């Protein structure tokens, strides 16, 4: 899986840890005859200041948004290659940060490309070799900056999961500052409680038909917060985590826990009786709030329940990892930027690697947090498996 929350400390409160990027691990180059046979799919993304209402009845707030120039969901097919142009209309240099891409496309923003300057643009080719749920943001260099910045959700289809409808819920938190406008992570929130948005807008009801099978792509677009979602009166079956298939399992009590950047694909079958409502609650460990509702109406789509969905087909990643010959690397993280950890804005790919390893050898990273605050850990360009003390791979 591409991204997990670990109890790690940031270098300082403004830096995202990216010291493992670069020579530390050789990112695989992905090729596909299917990808090469298709014409590239154009995609234009723009980062710009906007004013947007984040909750019903509230005045518009100043935020920085990452938006596609075309309307509609960003849904693509496995095997597509995106001809992606990024235009930076923000007053600061910016790079795009991808969650779920494989190999070189995910590492290029730090390894091979300069940040896009204010008013500048850049065009890259992004092969979508695997199906799954992706996220993109423009926050890598901006923690503690002038404004809070939103994220984007992308879906890559053809993973074998059949549902009547595909719903994406990109959940983001915004913390109003003293001026009433959301502050960027790393800036003082003045103790203000968060405002949660769904797909960049105030939360809304999700209309359904009785008997409908829904595929939900739940995404925690927060930069730091761990959130829990609880869906009342619903059997929630998890199918994929962080864009990678999982052995299907029911969410306990209809609850999903998502670290910052985590994506969970789940299936929910709407009851066949008309007029049912399922409340979606969100909790950040301090408060629990209503986020949205699944509301059914109209004629039933079907009256006989569907069988549970089968597991998604293999995505090419191994079911087991042989750890007997794995290289073990111990990494200690503290609040002081030093030889081991470098803030993204200062990253230099010609610097000394954190460690070296031969291609195709398994690596076990043992990370120790020496500070008092948590941080997100993003291993660019690689999937990894979170191990417990009894895990043998």
Where are these regions (language model features)?
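Asparagine-centered strand-capping/turn motif at beta-strand->loop junctions
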Residues: 86-90, 219-220, 367-371
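Short tyrosine-centred short linear motifs in exposed loops/low-complexity segments
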Residues: 79-80, 120, 128-134, 211-212, ...
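Extended terminal and domain-junction accessory segments
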Residues: 33-48, 144-176, 246-374, 381
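Extracytoplasmic/lumenal soluble domains of exported proteins with redox or metal-associated functions
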Residues: 34-136, 144-145
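N-terminal edge beta-strand
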Residues: 57-75, 194-205, 338-359
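Short, hydrophobic/aromatic beta-strand segments
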Residues: 93-99, 225-231, 375-379
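Histidine- and aromatic-rich segments of cupredoxin/plastocyanin-like copper-binding domains
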Residues: 105-118, 127, 171-173, 178, ...
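N-terminal secretory signal peptides
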Residues: 1-11, 22-24
